[in-house]
Amino acid sequence: MKKSYPVLVRNLLIIIAVLLIQVISLPGIHEGTVYAAACAPTDEDALGPFYRPGAPIRTSVGKGYVLQGVVRSSKDCAVVPGAVLELWLAGPDSGYDDAHRAALVADASGAYRFGSNLPPPYSGRPPHIHLRISAKSFATLVTQHYPVSDKNTAVFDIVIVPSR
């Protein structure tokens, strides 16, 4: 029984693809990283009582933690340049104040980068950063990022839904 060369190559590529999928899905391999899965919309989360519009335009409110990612459309996974991200978090004393609020704009490739302190837990809540994302022709999204405590950086890709 002799197999042709193209069939062997195809079978080998299938085996490699299956192995790669298994390696990529190993627990802990991407700890602290949240990727946009097939452009499924990012989950909404509570706005909370501490949101205030008019946050200062800046890319950092502290040191020790970096949150970065890309804003994409759920329609076609295209990047969303110019998306406005408003972020707010508790300061080291567990309180919310203007020093820990920021607004920034995703660049031409939809990318954003935000520096802050690692937010503390408070009142039974785990450490978290609130985000409100808005862009022309898209529904506004309110979500939260939950940092992994022993990491100082995270990738948090965001997928927003076009307006109807």
Regions found by a protein language model. Name each.
Residues 22-33:
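Membrane-interface motif at the C-terminal end of an N-terminal transmembrane signal
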